[in-house]
Amino acid sequence: MNTLDIQRHIADRLAGRRRLLVAFSGGLDSTVLLHALVQLRASCLPHLRLRVVHVHHGLSHFADQWVDHCESVCYLWQVPLHVLHVQVDTQRNSVEAAARDARYQAIAELIDSRETLLTAQHLDDQCETFLLALKRGSGPTGLSAMAQSMPFFVCEQLRPLLDISREQLTAYAQVHDLSWVEDDSNADARFDRNFLRMRIVPLLRERWPHFSEAVARSASLCAEQEQLLDELLMESLQALMSEDDALSIDGLLPLSEAKRYALLRRWIACFGVMMPTREQLQRLWHEVALAREDAEPQLHLAKCQVRRFRRRLYLLPTLRSLRDEVLRWDPHQPLTLPDGLGELQMGSRGVCVRAPTPGEAVTIRFCAQGVLRIVGRRHSRAIKKIWQELHIPPWERERTPMLYYGESLIAALGVFVTQEGQAVAGATMWNIHWSKDWM
């Protein structure tokens, strides 16, 4: 594939997309991609609107020099450059994954909803990704490796070089006398991807010269099989999901294990969560779905958790405990609740309760215990039973503001008022409104 072939290949992959945000590290791959786009804009695609983004991770001593290089290149080629600085969580097991997450989150905040994000992964990257998935014991989803096109937050990510080898990109760069930076970490064989690129893939290609192309075909076939399964299982999945995206356990029970796990995977994929391992799926089913009826089981997946309530599975963000929070409140002023739960304020609407006596301190908490009687009920009940009878899921109980006067529970706002808090005719009453930013 010569220079013009590569440019034509990229033009074909663009397929009418005209507003592009190019991820530019300054390395060989993204340099070739950006150069080809600039050439296309100058020759046959004058309506291309290019922007470039470079992410400074702060992980290398050379990071500032890379920024300088990218600025010089973009100035020369007359494309606007945005440099984003991110903080990478170096305490995570994989610094590479942490850097990728931080990079994509920063780019997501920059990209315009009408733009397409272009990244420069190529054929050899695809081969390495496939082998890494194979090493992890992945199924067809993981072995599909990287897609040519995929959703990126509210936009789209396109990889137009995925069929082009590193060798072809190097030849292109040499023909056009391009300069690029070398990431010093790419020479560190302690990283799995580098180990594959430096030691394993060259050995495989020495024996089988077209090994990377064969791997790419296998990845493509796996992706086709997954797409077919998605289409075949979509109707079944929709039948099992409620309006709040919960998944019916009873609907999964009579199914074969293979179909049940396939549906669980696709349900999880609906939330954009990293695909669970087989062991995690087995734990989800046996430890959460099939836990004893009086249990409140949960399983953490990446930054989410799977919970069960009333014979349904729910996938939720991981929430910090608020059990120890005690917020003093002057009800004549709005109160901002923690964790984005909204705001409390007095007004003409909301929960109606008696006003406190002069000696009663007003606080907001997020837990309650013991036995109490709520307005509208004749008998006292354990609060856990009350929650269950009102069909309030455990995770919502833990994030419902509880109004206390002294040590007396007055109301679970938006849910119930206790006998202690009942407004009596002729007495001073308060209306407390909870403006929710969640649920």
Curated annotation (Swiss-Prot):
* Annotated GO biological process: tRNA modification
Q: What is its EC number?
A: 6.3.4.19
Q: Does the keyword Lyase apply?
A: no
At the top level, the lineage of the source is Bacteria
Q: Which Gene3D superfamilies match?
A: 1.20.59.20, HUPs
Give one GO term, molecular function aspect. tRNA(Ile)-lysidine synthase activity
One Pfam annotation reads: ATP_bind_3
Signal sequence: where?
A: none
Instruction: Provide the binding site for ATP.
Output: S25, G26, G27, L28, D29, S30
Protein localization = Cytoplasm
Identify the keywords attached in UniProt to this record, alphabetized. ATP-binding, Cytoplasm, Ligase, Nucleotide-binding, tRNA processing
The catalytic activity, as recorded, is: cytidine(34) in tRNA(Ile2) + L-lysine + ATP = lysidine(34) in tRNA(Ile2) + AMP + diphosphate + H(+)
> Can you list the GO cellular component terms from the UniProt entry?
cytoplasm
Could you confirm whether the keyword Ligase appears in this record? yes
Give the NCBIfam families listed for this entry: lysidine_TilS_C, lysidine_TilS_N, PRK10660.1
Q: What does this protein do?
A: Ligates lysine onto the cytidine present at position 34 of the AUA codon-specific tRNA(Ile) that contains the anticodon CAU, in an ATP-dependent manner. Cytidine is converted to lysidine, thus changing the amino acid specificity of the tRNA from methionine to isoleucine.
Q: Which family does it belong to?
A: Belongs to the tRNA(Ile)-lysidine synthase family.
User: What does UniProt say about this protein's domains?
Assistant: The N-terminal region contains the highly conserved SGGXDS motif, predicted to be a P-loop motif involved in ATP binding.
**Protein's UniProt name:** tRNA(Ile)-lysidine synthase
- Species: Edwardsiella ictaluri (strain 93-146)
